[in-house]
Amino acid sequence: MSFRSLIQEMRDEFGSISRHSLRSRSHRGGGGAPRVAAVGPAEAAAMQQSCWAQLPPELLREVLVRIEESEVWWPSRRDVVACAGVCRSWRGITKEIVRVPEASGKLTFPISLKQPGPRDGTLKCFIRRNRTTQTYYLYIGLTEALADDGKFLLAARKCRKPTCTDYLISLDMSDMSKGSNTYIGKLRSNFLGTKFTVYDAHPPYDGAVVSKSRSARVVGLNQVSPRVPAGNYPVSHISYELNVLGARGPRRMNCIMDSIPTSAVQEGGKAPTQTEFPLSGLDSFPSISFFRSKSARIDSATSQLSTQKEEKLVLKNKSPRWHEQLQCWCLNFRGRVTVASVKNFQLVASDENGPTNQEQDKVILQFGKIGKDLFTMDYRYPISAFQSFAICLSSFDTKIACE
Protein backbone atom coordinates (compact mmCIF):
# COMPACT_ATOMS: atom_id res chain seq x y z
CA MET A 1 0.00 0.00 0.00
CA SER A 2 1.37 3.44 -0.94
CA PHE A 3 1.80 6.15 1.68
CA ARG A 4 -0.86 8.20 -0.06
CA SER A 5 -3.36 5.33 0.22
CA LEU A 6 -2.37 4.80 3.84
CA ILE A 7 -3.03 8.44 4.71
CA GLN A 8 -6.37 8.38 2.88
CA GLU A 9 -7.44 5.19 4.66
CA MET A 10 -6.47 6.59 8.06
CA ARG A 11 -8.31 9.81 7.31
CA ASP A 12 -11.49 7.98 6.29
CA GLU A 13 -11.29 5.77 9.38
CA PHE A 14 -10.90 8.64 11.82
CA GLY A 15 -13.56 10.61 9.99
CA SER A 16 -16.08 7.78 10.41
CA ILE A 17 -15.19 7.50 14.11
CA SER A 18 -15.81 11.22 14.60
CA ARG A 19 -19.13 11.14 12.75
CA HIS A 20 -20.28 8.08 14.72
CA SER A 21 -19.35 9.79 17.98
CA LEU A 22 -21.28 12.91 17.05
CA ARG A 23 -24.38 10.92 16.07
CA SER A 24 -24.24 9.03 19.36
CA ARG A 25 -24.07 12.24 21.37
CA SER A 26 -26.86 13.84 19.37
CA HIS A 27 -29.42 11.02 19.64
CA ARG A 28 -28.69 9.42 23.00
CA GLY A 29 -30.63 10.91 25.92
CA GLY A 30 -31.92 9.90 29.34
CA GLY A 31 -34.48 7.05 29.25
CA GLY A 32 -33.75 6.36 25.61
CA ALA A 33 -35.52 9.54 24.52
CA PRO A 34 -33.79 11.24 21.60
CA ARG A 35 -32.32 14.66 22.23
CA VAL A 36 -30.23 17.13 20.29
CA ALA A 37 -26.84 17.96 21.76
CA ALA A 38 -25.28 21.37 21.22
CA VAL A 39 -22.39 20.22 19.04
CA GLY A 40 -21.14 22.96 16.77
CA PRO A 41 -18.68 22.88 13.87
CA ALA A 42 -15.81 23.96 16.13
CA GLU A 43 -16.39 21.08 18.54
CA ALA A 44 -16.72 18.61 15.69
CA ALA A 45 -13.42 19.80 14.21
CA ALA A 46 -11.75 19.56 17.61
CA MET A 47 -12.97 15.99 18.08
CA GLN A 48 -11.70 14.97 14.65
CA GLN A 49 -8.33 16.66 15.26
CA SER A 50 -7.96 14.84 18.57
CA CYS A 51 -8.32 11.52 16.72
CA TRP A 52 -5.42 12.39 14.43
CA ALA A 53 -3.35 13.75 17.31
CA GLN A 54 -3.65 10.46 19.24
CA LEU A 55 -1.21 8.70 16.91
CA PRO A 56 2.09 7.85 18.67
CA PRO A 57 4.59 10.64 17.83
CA GLU A 58 7.38 8.18 17.00
CA LEU A 59 5.20 6.31 14.50
CA LEU A 60 3.83 9.53 13.05
CA ARG A 61 7.30 10.98 12.54
CA GLU A 62 8.51 7.81 10.82
CA VAL A 63 5.55 7.85 8.43
CA LEU A 64 5.95 11.56 7.64
CA VAL A 65 9.70 11.24 7.11
CA ARG A 66 9.14 8.48 4.55
CA ILE A 67 6.48 10.51 2.77
CA GLU A 68 8.77 13.55 2.63
CA GLU A 69 11.63 11.47 1.25
CA SER A 70 9.50 9.70 -1.37
CA GLU A 71 7.53 12.68 -2.70
CA VAL A 72 10.50 14.75 -3.80
CA TRP A 73 8.99 16.88 -6.58
CA TRP A 74 5.75 18.37 -7.77
CA PRO A 75 3.00 17.36 -8.33
CA SER A 76 3.51 14.49 -5.85
CA ARG A 77 5.06 16.99 -3.41
CA ARG A 78 1.54 18.18 -2.61
CA ASP A 79 1.13 15.06 -0.45
CA VAL A 80 3.70 16.50 1.97
CA VAL A 81 1.71 19.73 2.15
CA ALA A 82 -1.50 17.74 2.71
CA CYS A 83 0.08 16.04 5.73
CA ALA A 84 0.75 19.45 7.26
CA GLY A 85 -2.96 20.23 6.97
CA VAL A 86 -4.27 17.24 8.92
CA CYS A 87 -3.99 18.64 12.44
CA ARG A 88 -1.70 20.66 14.70
CA SER A 89 0.59 17.79 15.70
CA TRP A 90 1.00 16.64 12.09
CA ARG A 91 1.71 20.22 11.05
CA GLY A 92 4.38 20.68 13.70
CA ILE A 93 6.24 17.50 12.78
CA THR A 94 5.96 18.17 9.04
CA LYS A 95 7.43 21.66 9.44
CA GLU A 96 10.32 20.18 11.42
CA ILE A 97 11.02 17.58 8.75
CA VAL A 98 10.82 19.83 5.68
CA ARG A 99 14.13 21.64 5.22
CA VAL A 100 14.62 25.05 3.62
CA PRO A 101 15.50 25.19 -0.12
CA GLU A 102 19.07 26.17 0.75
CA ALA A 103 19.66 22.70 2.19
CA SER A 104 17.10 20.56 0.36
CA GLY A 105 16.82 22.17 -3.07
CA LYS A 106 13.02 21.79 -2.83
CA LEU A 107 10.11 24.23 -2.82
CA THR A 108 7.34 23.00 -0.53
CA PHE A 109 5.43 25.83 1.18
CA PRO A 110 4.82 29.38 -0.15
CA ILE A 111 7.39 30.77 2.31
CA SER A 112 9.99 28.78 0.34
CA LEU A 113 9.69 31.46 -2.35
CA LYS A 114 11.11 34.03 0.09
CA GLN A 115 13.99 31.79 1.20
CA PRO A 116 17.45 31.52 -0.43
CA GLY A 117 17.85 28.93 -3.18
CA PRO A 118 20.03 25.81 -2.93
CA ARG A 119 23.77 26.08 -2.32
CA ASP A 120 24.45 23.02 -4.46
CA GLY A 121 22.86 23.37 -7.87
CA THR A 122 20.10 25.63 -9.16
CA LEU A 123 16.30 25.67 -9.23
CA LYS A 124 15.20 25.71 -12.86
CA CYS A 125 12.15 27.85 -13.53
CA PHE A 126 10.54 29.61 -16.48
CA ILE A 127 8.44 32.72 -17.04
CA ARG A 128 5.45 33.08 -19.37
CA ARG A 129 4.57 36.57 -20.56
CA ASN A 130 1.10 37.69 -21.63
CA ARG A 131 1.50 40.84 -23.71
CA THR A 132 -2.24 41.51 -23.88
CA THR A 133 -2.82 41.65 -20.13
CA GLN A 134 0.76 42.73 -19.29
CA THR A 135 1.10 39.90 -16.82
CA TYR A 136 3.96 37.52 -16.06
CA TYR A 137 3.79 34.04 -14.53
CA LEU A 138 6.63 32.16 -12.85
CA TYR A 139 6.65 28.35 -12.86
CA ILE A 140 9.12 25.74 -11.71
CA GLY A 141 9.81 23.02 -14.24
CA LEU A 142 8.58 19.49 -13.61
CA THR A 143 10.87 17.82 -16.15
CA GLU A 144 14.26 18.42 -17.77
CA ALA A 145 12.55 20.24 -20.65
CA LEU A 146 13.13 23.99 -20.95
CA ALA A 147 9.39 24.53 -20.39
CA ASP A 148 6.54 22.18 -19.53
CA ASP A 149 3.21 22.43 -17.71
CA GLY A 150 5.17 23.55 -14.66
CA LYS A 151 4.14 24.24 -11.09
CA PHE A 152 2.85 27.79 -10.63
CA LEU A 153 4.84 29.88 -8.16
CA LEU A 154 4.30 33.63 -8.61
CA ALA A 155 2.51 36.13 -10.84
CA ALA A 156 3.13 39.81 -11.61
CA ARG A 157 1.10 42.55 -13.27
CA LYS A 158 2.54 45.66 -14.90
CA CYS A 159 0.99 48.95 -13.79
CA ARG A 160 2.04 52.12 -15.61
CA LYS A 161 2.05 55.44 -13.76
CA PRO A 162 2.94 58.97 -14.92
CA THR A 163 6.44 58.92 -13.41
CA CYS A 164 7.18 55.23 -12.86
CA THR A 165 6.10 51.66 -13.53
CA ASP A 166 5.14 49.09 -10.89
CA TYR A 167 5.13 45.31 -11.19
CA LEU A 168 2.87 43.93 -8.45
CA ILE A 169 3.88 40.41 -7.39
CA SER A 170 1.37 37.93 -5.95
CA LEU A 171 1.04 34.31 -4.88
CA ASP A 172 -2.29 34.15 -6.75
CA MET A 173 -2.35 34.21 -10.55
CA SER A 174 -5.92 35.52 -10.58
CA ASP A 175 -5.48 38.40 -8.10
CA MET A 176 -2.43 40.64 -8.44
CA SER A 177 -3.79 43.74 -6.71
CA LYS A 178 -1.87 45.44 -3.91
CA GLY A 179 -4.85 45.13 -1.58
CA SER A 180 -4.93 41.35 -1.96
CA ASN A 181 -3.94 39.07 0.91
CA THR A 182 -1.64 37.26 -1.52
CA TYR A 183 0.34 40.39 -2.46
CA ILE A 184 3.96 39.86 -1.38
CA GLY A 185 5.93 42.70 -2.97
CA LYS A 186 6.62 44.77 -6.05
CA LEU A 187 9.23 46.06 -8.46
CA ARG A 188 9.25 49.81 -9.16
CA SER A 189 11.15 51.56 -11.97
CA ASN A 190 12.01 55.19 -12.52
CA PHE A 191 10.66 57.10 -15.53
CA LEU A 192 13.66 56.23 -17.75
CA GLY A 193 13.63 52.54 -16.87
CA THR A 194 17.24 52.66 -15.71
CA LYS A 195 16.82 52.22 -11.96
CA PHE A 196 14.58 49.77 -10.12
CA THR A 197 13.78 49.00 -6.50
CA VAL A 198 12.45 45.67 -5.27
CA TYR A 199 10.11 46.03 -2.29
CA ASP A 200 9.11 43.19 0.01
CA ALA A 201 5.69 43.50 1.62
CA HIS A 202 7.07 41.72 4.70
CA PRO A 203 10.17 42.44 6.83
CA PRO A 204 13.05 40.55 5.13
CA TYR A 205 15.05 40.47 8.36
CA ASP A 206 14.75 41.50 11.99
CA GLY A 207 14.73 45.29 12.26
CA ALA A 208 14.06 46.01 8.58
CA VAL A 209 13.01 49.62 7.93
CA VAL A 210 9.90 50.31 5.89
CA SER A 211 10.20 52.74 2.99
CA LYS A 212 8.50 56.11 3.42
CA SER A 213 7.31 56.08 -0.17
CA ARG A 214 3.97 57.79 -0.79
CA SER A 215 2.70 54.53 -2.20
CA ALA A 216 3.25 52.71 1.09
CA ARG A 217 -0.07 52.26 2.82
CA VAL A 218 -1.84 49.96 5.22
CA VAL A 219 -4.68 48.01 3.70
CA GLY A 220 -7.83 46.98 5.56
CA LEU A 221 -7.54 45.51 9.03
CA ASN A 222 -9.34 42.42 7.82
CA GLN A 223 -6.45 41.84 5.41
CA VAL A 224 -3.39 42.66 7.48
CA SER A 225 -2.48 41.40 10.92
CA PRO A 226 -2.34 44.39 13.32
CA ARG A 227 0.78 42.87 14.92
CA VAL A 228 2.88 43.35 11.78
CA PRO A 229 3.50 46.72 10.09
CA ALA A 230 2.53 46.72 6.43
CA GLY A 231 4.69 48.60 3.98
CA ASN A 232 7.44 48.55 1.40
CA TYR A 233 10.70 47.05 2.64
CA PRO A 234 13.47 47.66 0.05
CA VAL A 235 15.43 44.46 -0.54
CA SER A 236 17.25 45.24 -3.78
CA HIS A 237 18.28 48.15 -6.00
CA ILE A 238 18.88 47.44 -9.70
CA SER A 239 20.58 49.85 -12.10
CA TYR A 240 21.22 49.66 -15.84
CA GLU A 241 24.12 51.65 -17.26
CA LEU A 242 24.20 53.60 -20.52
CA ASN A 243 24.87 51.33 -23.48
CA VAL A 244 27.07 53.09 -26.05
CA LEU A 245 26.22 50.44 -28.66
CA GLY A 246 22.49 50.99 -28.25
CA ALA A 247 20.12 48.07 -28.74
CA ARG A 248 22.86 46.06 -30.49
CA GLY A 249 25.11 45.83 -27.45
CA PRO A 250 24.76 43.87 -24.21
CA ARG A 251 23.20 45.54 -21.22
CA ARG A 252 25.24 46.34 -18.11
CA MET A 253 23.44 45.94 -14.80
CA ASN A 254 24.22 46.00 -11.09
CA CYS A 255 22.07 44.71 -8.23
CA ILE A 256 22.63 45.86 -4.67
CA MET A 257 21.00 43.32 -2.37
CA ASP A 258 19.98 45.42 0.65
CA SER A 259 18.88 42.42 2.71
CA ILE A 260 21.90 40.16 2.01
CA PRO A 261 25.35 40.85 3.54
CA THR A 262 28.54 40.35 1.57
CA SER A 263 29.55 37.57 3.95
CA ALA A 264 26.68 35.43 2.61
CA VAL A 265 28.80 34.36 -0.38
CA GLN A 266 31.94 33.80 1.68
CA GLU A 267 32.88 30.58 3.41
CA GLY A 268 30.62 29.97 6.40
CA GLY A 269 28.38 32.89 5.43
CA LYS A 270 24.64 32.99 5.96
CA ALA A 271 21.85 34.81 4.12
CA PRO A 272 18.68 36.09 5.86
CA THR A 273 15.94 33.46 5.84
CA GLN A 274 12.28 34.26 6.44
CA THR A 275 10.54 31.36 8.17
CA GLU A 276 6.91 32.51 8.19
CA PHE A 277 4.63 35.01 6.51
CA PRO A 278 3.37 37.66 8.96
CA LEU A 279 0.09 38.17 7.09
CA SER A 280 -2.91 36.24 8.37
CA GLY A 281 -4.39 36.00 4.88
CA LEU A 282 -1.50 33.97 3.47
CA ASP A 283 -2.69 30.63 4.78
CA SER A 284 -2.97 29.18 1.31
CA PHE A 285 -2.78 29.75 -2.42
CA PRO A 286 -3.61 27.49 -5.39
CA SER A 287 -2.23 23.96 -4.96
CA ILE A 288 -0.12 24.86 -1.92
CA SER A 289 -1.25 25.31 1.65
CA PHE A 290 0.70 27.28 4.20
CA PHE A 291 0.39 27.24 7.94
CA ARG A 292 1.74 29.78 10.38
CA SER A 293 2.02 30.12 14.14
CA LYS A 294 1.00 33.15 16.17
CA SER A 295 4.06 35.22 15.33
CA ALA A 296 6.30 35.78 12.35
CA ARG A 297 9.86 34.63 12.87
CA ILE A 298 13.15 35.44 11.19
CA ASP A 299 16.16 33.14 11.31
CA SER A 300 18.15 34.08 14.41
CA ALA A 301 21.36 34.07 12.40
CA THR A 302 20.13 37.07 10.42
CA SER A 303 19.63 39.68 13.10
CA GLN A 304 19.40 43.41 12.51
CA LEU A 305 22.93 43.89 13.84
CA SER A 306 24.62 41.51 11.41
CA THR A 307 22.68 42.83 8.42
CA GLN A 308 23.14 46.55 9.02
CA LYS A 309 26.83 46.56 9.99
CA GLU A 310 28.07 44.46 7.09
CA GLU A 311 28.42 45.61 3.51
CA LYS A 312 25.61 44.71 1.15
CA LEU A 313 26.04 42.04 -1.49
CA VAL A 314 26.49 43.42 -5.01
CA LEU A 315 25.67 41.37 -8.10
CA LYS A 316 26.76 42.31 -11.61
CA ASN A 317 26.03 40.87 -15.02
CA LYS A 318 28.64 38.55 -16.46
CA SER A 319 30.29 40.17 -19.46
CA PRO A 320 29.49 38.36 -22.74
CA ARG A 321 32.07 37.76 -25.45
CA TRP A 322 31.76 38.72 -29.08
CA HIS A 323 31.38 35.75 -31.44
CA GLU A 324 32.95 36.71 -34.76
CA GLN A 325 31.31 33.97 -36.83
CA LEU A 326 27.83 34.45 -35.40
CA GLN A 327 28.26 38.22 -35.22
CA CYS A 328 26.62 38.45 -31.81
CA TRP A 329 27.39 38.65 -28.10
CA CYS A 330 27.45 35.23 -26.43
CA LEU A 331 27.19 33.74 -22.93
CA ASN A 332 27.33 30.09 -21.96
CA PHE A 333 23.82 29.31 -20.69
CA ARG A 334 24.50 25.57 -20.82
CA GLY A 335 21.59 24.92 -23.15
CA ARG A 336 19.04 26.77 -21.03
CA VAL A 337 18.69 29.72 -23.44
CA THR A 338 18.09 29.26 -27.17
CA VAL A 339 17.11 32.68 -28.56
CA ALA A 340 19.42 35.70 -28.76
CA SER A 341 17.96 38.67 -26.91
CA VAL A 342 19.16 41.85 -25.24
CA LYS A 343 17.15 40.71 -22.21
CA ASN A 344 19.38 37.67 -21.61
CA PHE A 345 21.79 37.95 -18.67
CA GLN A 346 23.78 36.11 -16.01
CA LEU A 347 24.46 37.59 -12.56
CA VAL A 348 27.55 36.82 -10.48
CA ALA A 349 28.96 38.25 -7.26
CA SER A 350 30.87 41.47 -7.91
CA ASP A 351 34.61 41.43 -7.25
CA GLU A 352 34.12 44.34 -4.84
CA ASN A 353 32.47 41.87 -2.45
CA GLY A 354 35.82 40.13 -2.05
CA PRO A 355 34.67 36.55 -2.78
CA THR A 356 37.07 33.85 -3.90
CA ASN A 357 37.55 33.25 -7.62
CA GLN A 358 35.47 30.09 -7.33
CA GLU A 359 32.55 31.94 -5.73
CA GLN A 360 32.89 34.81 -8.18
CA ASP A 361 32.50 32.45 -11.15
CA LYS A 362 29.26 30.94 -9.84
CA VAL A 363 26.21 32.17 -11.73
CA ILE A 364 23.67 33.14 -9.06
CA LEU A 365 20.87 34.06 -11.47
CA GLN A 366 20.48 33.56 -15.20
CA PHE A 367 17.61 34.61 -17.42
CA GLY A 368 17.08 34.14 -21.13
CA LYS A 369 14.66 33.71 -24.00
CA ILE A 370 13.63 30.31 -25.36
CA GLY A 371 10.58 31.25 -27.43
CA LYS A 372 7.92 33.85 -28.03
CA ASP A 373 6.94 35.22 -24.61
CA LEU A 374 8.77 32.33 -22.93
CA PHE A 375 11.92 32.69 -20.81
CA THR A 376 13.95 30.51 -18.45
CA MET A 377 14.97 31.67 -14.97
CA ASP A 378 17.52 29.66 -12.96
CA TYR A 379 18.59 30.80 -9.50
CA ARG A 380 20.57 29.60 -6.51
CA TYR A 381 21.80 30.71 -3.07
CA PRO A 382 21.87 33.42 -1.70
CA ILE A 383 18.83 34.93 -3.46
CA SER A 384 15.23 33.71 -3.36
CA ALA A 385 12.65 32.98 -6.05
CA PHE A 386 10.86 36.23 -5.19
CA GLN A 387 14.03 38.31 -5.55
CA SER A 388 15.02 36.48 -8.74
CA PHE A 389 11.60 36.99 -10.32
CA ALA A 390 11.65 40.71 -9.51
CA ILE A 391 15.14 41.14 -11.00
CA CYS A 392 14.06 39.34 -14.17
CA LEU A 393 10.98 41.56 -14.45
CA SER A 394 13.31 44.57 -14.65
CA SER A 395 14.74 43.13 -17.88
CA PHE A 396 11.30 43.30 -19.53
CA ASP A 397 10.89 47.02 -18.89
CA THR A 398 11.68 49.55 -21.62
CA LYS A 399 14.96 51.37 -21.02
CA ILE A 400 14.73 54.72 -22.77
CA ALA A 401 18.08 56.11 -21.64
CA CYS A 402 20.07 52.91 -22.18
CA GLU A 403 19.01 52.01 -25.69
Swiss-Prot record:
F-box domain boundaries: 50-105
Gene3D superfamilies (UniProt xref): 1.20.1280.50, Tubby Protein, Chain A
Domain of life: Eukaryota
PROSITE patterns: TUB_1
Tissue occurrence: Ubiquitous.
CDD domains: F-box_AtTLP-like
Pfam families registered for this protein in UniProt: Tub
Annotated PANTHER family: TUBBY-LIKE F-BOX PROTEIN 9, TUBBY-RELATED
Similarity comment: Belongs to the TUB family.
Protein name as annotated: Tubby-like F-box protein 6
Protein species of origin: Oryza sativa subsp. japonica (Rice)
Gene name, Swiss-Prot/TrEMBL: TULP6
